[in-house]
């Protein structure tokens, strides 16, 4: 009896690593001479970050600092969706950063179609915000993973539950 193997394609990030990256950025903001007196706040909510600071120059520096800390913690930079900066009153600037999580339906359909077109022996199935790929040959599944890693998608893809 031949068994089937499968894996899931998801778009997720490690929340604790994000918390650590934000904490490191806050600490460095307090230490850096050019950012010390800007009264910068980085607030981490469930699905977004809010950066509030004195001016656009400080905002750009903080954005670069946050991205650097996130990359060093192993987070993909594709999870950050920077919204346009807005005035926060009192000569301050605020920028909201949405955190991308999950694969939307159109991208899931695109991934499933690409797998179906290139690999006839595996079956992709869309299940909510993940795509499950199953097949009888482990090597085919490995080839699917390699093909998807070479593509450039607007979200960071992870491959989990490989059985």
Swiss-Prot record:
Matching InterPro entries: DUF520 (IPR007551), UPF0234-like_C (IPR035571), UPF0234_N (IPR035570), YajQ-like_sf (IPR036183)
GO terms for cellular component: cytosol
SUPFAM superfamilies membership: YajQ-like
Keywords from the UniProt entry: Nucleotide-binding
Claim: Nucleotide-binding is one of the keywords in the record: yes
HAMAP family in the record: YajQ
Family (UniProt): Belongs to the YajQ family.
Name of the protein in its database record: Nucleotide-binding protein CYB_0891
